[in-house]
Curated annotation (Swiss-Prot):
Residues 174-176 are annotated as: G5. Pfam families: GTP_EFTU (PF00009), GTP_EFTU_D2 (PF03144), GTP_EFTU_D3 (PF03143). GTP hydrolase that promotes the GTP-dependent binding of aminoacyl-tRNA to the A-site of ribosomes during protein biosynthesis. It is an enzyme of class 3 (hydrolase). It comes from Shewanella pealeana (strain ATCC 700345 / ANG-SQ1). Its main location: cytoplasm. This is Elongation factor Tu. The lineage of its organism: Bacteria, Pseudomonadati, Pseudomonadota, Gammaproteobacteria, Alteromonadales.
Length: 394
C-alpha cells in the first residue's frame, strides 16, 4: 500500500504563550517544539534559538518575538513567544501577533502572579478568544492538594475576566522535564497539543467573513460612474451585490456594478486583493478615503469606545513628555486620521511614554468599527501610540 499523501492543506492556527516572567513560557515553547517534532515530524527549535528572539518593528514599535511552527496530525500551528513583559503588551495591542488562542503558563510553585493577571486582562481587552492553561513545574510540587489549590486559583482568576474558568482545559506538567525527554512529562505536552486541537475552534478564514473594503481612493470614470479602490480586508464582493458606505458621514447604500483589478473586469473581488469597485448612483463627492465599503448591516459607525493603548517610548520615536486628560491627538483607523479626545481611568493623572493604559476615546466623526479593531495614535503624521478597540460605547 502506498504511503499516505502528505497533506499540505491542514487548517492553520495562530497561538502563543503568555504568563508571568520566569514561569516557563519559553521552556514550554521549546518543549512543544521538541515533543511534537519527535512525535509527528518537522524541524525542532531549541530553547536558545527561541530565547534569542529577533527584534521586529510593527508600526514603528520595536518588539522582540520568536515565531516557531509545529504540527499535530490535524493542524499546523504558528506559535509566538516573547522574552519580556513589555513585548507582550506591545504585541497584543498592535495585533502584530494575532492569536486564535493562548497558552497561559503558570508555575505551580508560585501560582498566579501580577503579570498572570495582566496578561489575562490584556487577552480580554484585545479579544484573544480562547485560553488553555499549562501549570508548569509540577515535578517540583509533591503536594497534590497544593496543585489543586493553584488550579482553582487560576480558574477563578480567568472567570473574573469573563473567560470560562470552570470549563477551560488545565494541563499539569513540567516543560523542563519534557524537554529533557522524560516520557511521563512528554505525555503532558501531547495532552496540551490535544487540548489545542480540540478546544480552540478552527479560525474563520478572512474570505469567509462579511465583506469589508477600507476605501483608499475614489475616482470618477466618465460614462461609468464612481470607482472606489482599496484592499479587500474580509469576504468577497460580487458584481450585482448591495453594499453600504459606512463611516464619517451618514451610511449610504449602493450596488456594485463592476469589480476590476489591473484594468481587467472581474466577477468578484476577494479578501487580500487590491481592487476597484464601481458603485451605482454614487457621486464622487459622496465618498471619501477613510470610509469602508461593507456588506449591508455587517458593521456600524461609532464615535465613543473604550480602548487599550500602548504609548511609544522616546527611544521608539514617540513623545518625550507625558500627556494628560484633554489630550487631542489623531486616531488613525485603517486609511484615515480622525481627531478625538481622551478620558483617562479614575486615579490616572498622566500617561508616560512607554506606558500602557485603558482609556475612553471620543472621535469628532464616526468611524466603522468592531471590537478588536486596531488603530494608531498620531500627532501631525507621526505615530506616538498604538491601540485596540476593547468595547464600543456609542
Amino acid at each position: 500500500m502506498a504511503k499516505e499523501k502528505f497533506e499540505r492543506v491542514k487548517p492553520h492556527v495562530n497561538v502563543g504563550t503568555i504568563g508571568h516572567v520566569d514561569h516557563g513560557k519559553t521552556t514550554l515553547t521549546a518543549a512543544i517544539s521538541s515533543v511534537l517534532t519527535k512525535t509527528y515530524g518537522g524541524t525542532k527549535r531549541d530553547f536558545a534559538q527561541i530565547d534569542n528572539a529577533p527584534e521586529e518593528r510593527e508600526r514603528g514599535i520595536t518588539i522582540n518575538t520568536s515565531h516557531i511552527e509545529y504540527d499535530t496530525p490535524s493542524r499546523h500551528y504558528a506559535h509566538v513567544d516573547c522574552p519580556g513583559h513589555a513585548d507582550y503588551v506591545k504585541n497584543m495591542i498592535t495585533g502584530a501577533a494575532q492569536m486564535d488562542g493562548a497558552i497561559l503558563v503558570v508555575a505551580s510553585t508560585d501560582g498566579p502572579m501580577p503579570q498572570t493577571r495582566e496578561h489575562i486582562l490584556l487577552s480580554r481587552q484585545v479579544g484573544v478568544p480562547f485560553i488553555i492553561v499549562f501549570m508548569n513545574k509540577c515535578d517540583m510540587v509533591d503536594d497534590e492538594e497544593l496543585l489543586e489549590l493553584v488550579e482553582m486559583e487560576v480558574r477563578e482568576l480567568l472567570s473574573e475576566y469573563d473567560f470560562p474558568g470552570d470549563d477551560l482545559p488545565v494541563i499539569q506538567g513540567s516543560a523542563l522535564k519534557a524537554l529533557e525527554g522524560e516520557p511521563e512529562w512528554e505525555a503532558k505536552i501531547l495532552e496540551l497539543a490535544e487540548a489545542l486541537d480540540t478546544y480552540i475552534p478552527e479560525p474563520e478564514r478572512a474570505i469567509d467573513g462579511a465583506f469589508i473594503l477600507p476605501i483608499e481612493d475614489v475616482f470618477s470614470i466618465a460614462g461609468r460612474g464612481t470607482v472606489v479602490t482599496g484592499r479587500v480586508e474580509r469576504g468577497i464582493i460580487k458584481v450585482g451585490e448591495e453594499v453600504e458606505i459606512v463611516g464619517i458621514k451618514d451610511t449610504t447604500k449602493s450596488t456594485c456594478t463592476g469589480v476590476e483589478m489591473f484594468r481587467k473586469l472581474l466577477d468578484e473581488g476577494r479578501a487580500g486583493e487590491n481592487c476597484g469597485v464601481l458603485l451605482r448612483g454614487i457621486k464622487r463627492e459622496d465618498v471619501e478615503r477613510g470610509q469602508v465599503l461593507a456588506a449591508p448591516g455587517s458593521i456600524t459607525p461609532h464615535t465613543t469606545f473604550k480602548s487599550e493603548i500602548y504609548v511609544l517610548s522616546k527611544e521608539e520615536g514617540g513623545r518625550h513628555t507625558p500627556f494628560f486628560k484633554g489630550y487631542r491627538p489623531q486616531f488613525y483607523f485603517r486609511t484615515t486620521d480622525v481627531t478625538g479626545t481622551i478620558e483617562l481611568p479614575e486615579g490616572v493623572e498622566m500617561v508616560m511614554p512607554g506606558d500602557n493604559v485603558a482609556m475612553t476615546v471620543t472621535l469628532i466623526c464616526p468611524i466603522a468599527m468592531d471590537e478588536g479593531l486596531r488603530f494608531a495614535i498620531r500627532e501631525g503624521g507621526r505615530t506616538v501610540g498604538a491601540g485596540v478597540v476593547a468595547e464600543i460605547v456609542a
